[in-house]
């Protein structure tokens, strides 16, 4: 099982590259890597990013998005790594701007996936908040690759397009025993300021 850290965004709203922003002196991407490593669930943790940022990560396992799908958002990162690892049975996806994700959240979602896998033939297990799904904290089966490829070849790179074609189930973020901010995206500087005040 592989983990994909999505870190190829342009971070326009934040004002600088979010992957290298810090919480308590630790970069977002380093925090996420450390959390994923702590679960002992993954045989490989891969950072998915663009050519401009790739050399800035102090981490050996960085993959640049497929050149045919530059600037097509997070789906391009998932597509690129799935294509490179056709033998893999499962991929966990997390965005780099979710620095407070916990190992407990990852393992809880995995247990949810396993318990529903046979009965529902799930392709995707994701979290949801107030009925809104969070596609960038989710497990994806390789079966999702076809729908992702189709979306990338269309003019609509949204996860909704992909999810409509797949067997998907959701776990509520409140079902995780963790601080309420564990799944929050940091989109703006004031989001980070608010988070730091809570810590």
Curated annotation (Swiss-Prot):
Its cofactor is Mg(2+). It is found in: Cytoplasm. It catalyses: Mo-molybdopterin + GTP + H(+) = Mo-molybdopterin guanine dinucleotide + diphosphate. CDD domains: MobA. One of its GO terms (molecular function) is GTP binding. One of its GO terms (biological process) is Mo-molybdopterin cofactor biosynthetic process. Its EC number is 2.7.7.77. Keywords: Cytoplasm, GTP-binding, Magnesium, Metal-binding, Molybdenum cofactor biosynthesis, Nucleotide-binding, Transferase. Pfam families: NTP_transf_3 (PF12804). GO terms for cellular component: cytoplasm. The keyword Membrane does not apply. It comes from the Bacteria. It is an enzyme of class 2 (transferase). Transfers a GMP moiety from GTP to Mo-molybdopterin (Mo-MPT) cofactor (Moco or molybdenum cofactor) to form Mo-molybdopterin guanine dinucleotide (Mo-MGD) cofactor. Belongs to the MobA family. The N-terminal domain determines nucleotide recognition and specific binding, while the C-terminal domain determines the specific binding to the target protein. This is Probable molybdenum cofactor guanylyltransferase.
């Amino acid at each position: 099982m592989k983990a994909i850290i999505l870190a190829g965004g342009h971070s326009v709203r934040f004002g600088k590259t979010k992957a290298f922003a810090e919480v308590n002196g630790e970069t977002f991407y380093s925090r996420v890597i450390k959390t994923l490593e702590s679960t002992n669930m993954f045989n490989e943790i891969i950072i998915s990013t663009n050519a401009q940022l790739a050399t800035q990560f102090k981490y050996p396992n960085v993959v640049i998005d497929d050149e045919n799908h530059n600037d097509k958002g997070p789906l391009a990162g998932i597509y690129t790594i799935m294509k490179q690892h056709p033998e893999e049975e499962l991929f966990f996806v997390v965005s780099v701007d979710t620095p407070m994700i916990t190992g407990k959240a990852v393992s809880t979602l995995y247990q949810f996936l396993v318990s529903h896998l046979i009965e529902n033939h799930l392709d995707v297990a994701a979290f949801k908040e107030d009925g809104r799904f969070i596609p960038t904290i989710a497990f994806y089966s390789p079966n999702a690759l076809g729908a992702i490829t189709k979306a990338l070849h269309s003019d609509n790179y949204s996860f909704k397009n992909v999810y409509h074609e797949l067997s998907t189930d959701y776990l509520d973020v409140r079902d995780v025993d963790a601080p309420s901010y564990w799944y929050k995206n940091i989109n703006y500087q004031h989001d980070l300021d608010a988070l730091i005040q809570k810590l």
